[in-house]
């Protein structure tokens, strides 16, 4: 079946009845153009955030069984979106039906709240589309081998959409949101930020992992693996958006820096005077076993004792702190310092590979504006710095200006 479109609509695109009707209008036009449409939906508006805040009033949710119930609860938002959109489409005469993760099924690992997709069975979906128009699938969720509901982590509906496209053999996935593409920085922080017409997978992976909120990083990794183009569009503003594709389809020669990201979802942890190297090995082994992502790592050695500083997502701070207190005697440190008052600011661009002096320009821009650099990490296409939270937005603005990202000539174009 070659006439299938895969489209994902985020929470802001579904936040109220007017928005749902607008989404239904977009889908109805596709059906009028003789397409079958597979739609992946997020929860309406702030539903998931609101339900999480209520969960926290009941439980800290740290054990496996608590996380299982947590997934059951927070996956309910997508179920509501599915049903509401299906009703809106049926009202207009469209043959639509909602599907939950277990009904396909979408099979995942049993890592509750951070599950990974193992397999998607599309047989029932394909059979349904033979005589029907639209399948609406709940994003963000699946089920593991014990038939319990799992969720894919925040933003997981993006990953659901790309995975479903891959399972169907579709090489283009449309991602609808409330903004009209990928920008050089967050327009809420940088009013002069420019929209990119095209961006390469590896740049977008860095931007997503470093704080850009348009796409979940796992969805970009999956798109790159299966060579699925992602077209980022606004539900409410009919512009051409941004296309995410491989480097060979973009004229990269003129590019230096593609974007600046600002990530406030970070916290730093320092362990003072870790006594031996095996303590460090044990530390990061235990953190990995608990599926906690460590980013920046800084080690200072003095007389066979180490000070270790590392950063983690802010939401992982409670469980990480609990773990570190529990294993204090095992890894032998003297003091634990928690600092949530930091942000990570990063510059990203494939052009920096062949241009010396980028790091100097970044550091000089920050220090000349009295912004303290607490930590640095680099890769071929990005440099990240940790700065005090109070300086994060200023740092982003200074760097965006310094690298002239609001200049028309810096936008990605087709080759």
Residue locations for each model-derived region?
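Short hydrophobic alpha-helical runs that function as membrane-insertion/retention elements
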Residues: 172-176, 230-232, 295, 375
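Short phosphate-binding/catalytic loops that engage adenosine nucleotides
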Residues: 35, 94, 228, 292, ...
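A conserved regulatory-domain signal marking ACT and ACT-like small-molecule sensing domains
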Residues: 243-415
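Glycine-rich beta-alpha junction loops
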Residues: 44, 179-181, 226-230, 234-239, ...
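Terminal amphipathic helices with adjacent charged low-complexity linkers/tails
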Residues: 42-48, 232-250, 305
């Amino acid at each position: 079946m070659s006439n299938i479109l895969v489209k994902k609509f985020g929470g802001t695109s579904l936040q109220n009845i007017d928005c749902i009707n607008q989404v239904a209008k977009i889908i109805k036009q596709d059906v009028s153009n003789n397409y079958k449409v597979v739609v992946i939906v997020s929860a309406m508006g702030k539903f998931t955030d609101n339900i999480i805040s209520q969960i926290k009033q009941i439980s800290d949710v740290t054990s496996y069984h608590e996380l299982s119930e947590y997934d059951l609860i927070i996956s309910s938002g997508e179920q509501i979106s599915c049903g509401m959109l299906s009703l809106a489409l049926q009202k207009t005469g469209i043959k639509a039906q909602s599907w939950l993760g277990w009904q396909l099924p979408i099979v995942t690992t049993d890592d509750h709240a951070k599950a990974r997709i193992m397999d998607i069975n599309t047989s029932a979906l394909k059979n349904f589309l033979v005589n029907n128009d639209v399948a609406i699938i709940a994003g963000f969720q699946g089920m593991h081998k014990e038939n319990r509901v799992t969720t894919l982590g925040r933003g997981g509906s993006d990953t659901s959409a790309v995975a479903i496209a891959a399972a169907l053999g579709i090489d283009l996935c449309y991602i609808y949101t409330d903004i009209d593409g990928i920008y050089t920085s967050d327009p809420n922080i940088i009013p002069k930020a420019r929209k990119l017409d095209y961006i390469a997978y590896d740049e977008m992976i860095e931007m997503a992992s470093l704080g850009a909120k348009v796409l979940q990083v796992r969805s970009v990794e999956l798109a790159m693996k299966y060579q699925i183009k992602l077209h980022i569009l606004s539900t409410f503003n009919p512009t051409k958006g941004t296309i995410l594709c491989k480097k060979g389809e973009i004229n990269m020669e003129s590019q230096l820096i593609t974007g600046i990201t600002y990530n406030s979802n970070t916290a730093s942890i320092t362990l003072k005077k870790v006594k031996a190297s095996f303590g460090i090995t044990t530390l990061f082994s235990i953190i990995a076993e608990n599926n906690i992502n460590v980013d920046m790592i800084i080690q200072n050695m003095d007389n066979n004792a180490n000070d270790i500083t590392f950063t983690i997502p802010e939401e992982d701070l409670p469980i990480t702190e609990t773990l570190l207190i529990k294993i204090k005697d095992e890894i032998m440190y003297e003091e634990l310092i928690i600092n949530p008052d930091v942000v990570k600011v990063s510059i990203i661009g494939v052009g920096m590979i062949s241009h010396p002096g980028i790091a100097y320009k970044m550091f000089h821009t920050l220090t000349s504006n009295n912004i303290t650099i607490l930590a640095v990490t680099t890769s071929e296409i990005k440099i990240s710095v940790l700065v005090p939270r109070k300086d994060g937005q200023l740092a982003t603005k200074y760097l965006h200006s310094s690298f002239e990202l609001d200049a028309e000539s810096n936008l990605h174009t087709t080759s």
